[in-house]
Amino acid sequence: MAKKAVASRGARCYAWPPMRKRFFLPAAPRGARAPLRFAADAPWLAPLAGYSDLPFRLLCRHYGAAVCVTEMVSAKGLVHKSPGTGELLLSLPEDQPLVVQLFGAEPEVLGAAVLALRGAGYAWFDCNMGCSVPKVMRQGAGAALLGDTARALACARAMIGAAGGQGRVGFKLRLGLDRDRSILPDLALRLEDAGASWLALHPRTARQGFGGSADWEAIARLAARLSIPLLASGDLLTARDGVRCLAETGASGVMYARGALHDPAVFATHLALLRGKSPPAPDAAALRAMISLHVRLARQYGGDGGALLKMRSLAPRYVRFLPGVRVLRQRLCRCTDWQELEAALDEFLDGAVLS
């Protein structure tokens, strides 16, 4: 896809084209085949529907995310060339390695989607078998696959075969549909036998959604049974949670989701803790730098309209612990352009007092 080069402080960057109403599949950028890392010091950014777009991934990589996963991409949308699907795949060389997460319930469609992505240069794929959103489950996709092991395995084999064998495809799982219908360790072991390269486990059931507590003991039990990497997810709201989860479960690595939404610098804090360093307390200057970077990335790569709406939602999360954030949120909701939004954030941070 053509990109118009523009100057920015002596560096080469790109002005992203406006969003298109027709379907297009962007070619994977240089570095798309960079190897994945599974290690305590290689924290991943989880797939976050509506949030883990290119600007947010670049922000998280700035703070140390080793691998990022796209938002959920509909396999059917790719195969049938639905408008808007391709935008979820926009990337850059510095956004690598990147895992494309697909969702769907038809093995032949998932396989065809992987083939199309491989043809465009993408190298790493993930199948969502954990999304508990009713809209997704009604399609038989996401966590609904946990209730149909035969279909789940057929989908897995189709993706692995289309990807060219072992080493390219992972699967994100939950414990099962509910406590009475656990799929562990049976499905996980069968996915490993089918050629899965890695698994990620959010140790809640589909019925739980995000309620209750994540069962980290289930991660530990599964990690002890697998010979492929296992990424831990669930209740990793801070870097200390992530480091503690690694110690308690023996997982190969961690995947931050809500923790990254609240604080994209969670990756830097995670790495500091592993090195035995005390991370610095948050201050207004650090918050301003993080928010300013996200705004700049969103303006450059986020397309029209939607990027501003998304930033109006995200910015208050970053300063949620400061007094006056409710008023800020209300003010941001009335912002209709980037200048208004930046002025509101600057005014808020100028008066911020961090204890």
Feature annotation, model-predicted:
Residues P43-P47, C68-T70, L98-L102, F125, ...:
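Hydrophobic faces of well-ordered beta-strands that scaffold small-molecule active sites
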Residues A112-F125, M129-Q139, A150-I228:
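Alpha/beta enzyme core
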Residues K3, W16-W44, A49, L54-P55, ...:
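Alpha/beta catalytic cores of nucleotide-metabolism and tRNA/nucleoside-modifying enzymes
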Residues R20-A39, L48-A123:
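Glycine-rich, positively charged N-terminal anion/phosphate-binding segment
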Residues G140-L146:
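Short glycine-enriched, charge-decorated loop/helix-capping segments at active-site entrances
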Residues L48-G50, V73-A75, F103-A105, G130-S132, ...:
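Active-site beta-loop-alpha junctions enriched in small/polar residues
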Residues M1-R9:
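Extreme N-terminal basic, low-complexity initiation segments
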Residues A7, Y14-A15:
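Short, positively charged and aromatic/hydrophobic N-terminal segments
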